[in-house]
Amino acid sequence: MKLDTDQKLPAALLAVQARPLTNTEGVQVNDCYISDLLSDVLARAKPGMLWVTVQIHRNVISVAATNDIAAVLFTCGRQPDASVIAEAEAEGIVLLTTPLTTYEAAGKLWQAGIHD
């Protein structure tokens, strides 16, 4: 099932038991990219994507802002510190966390229609 863009973030939140760390209102995602290698994300992630990673440091926000990534989902229950969350809010990037592994999250996101 292919979802409309405005349905994808709510579907993603439900699919992976995500907990928002920043405001999600009005944010839309159009696809998903999964990688822990920042240079890979810089080279391949597209604007408006949901980025799935275990990385929680401030460089994640810089990469997300550079590529105009709509939201970042941290897996394995990982959560960045308050300064990283504040930086994401200032950049308008949604941060989410899930207790699922990256592999589990990938499967559930695909099943929920979070793909192009």
What are these regions (language model features)?
Residues 1-44, 109:
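Conserved catalytic and cofactor-binding micro-motifs
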Residues 35-50, 54-116:
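Feature captures the catalytic cores and cofactor-binding loops of soluble hydro-lyases/lyases
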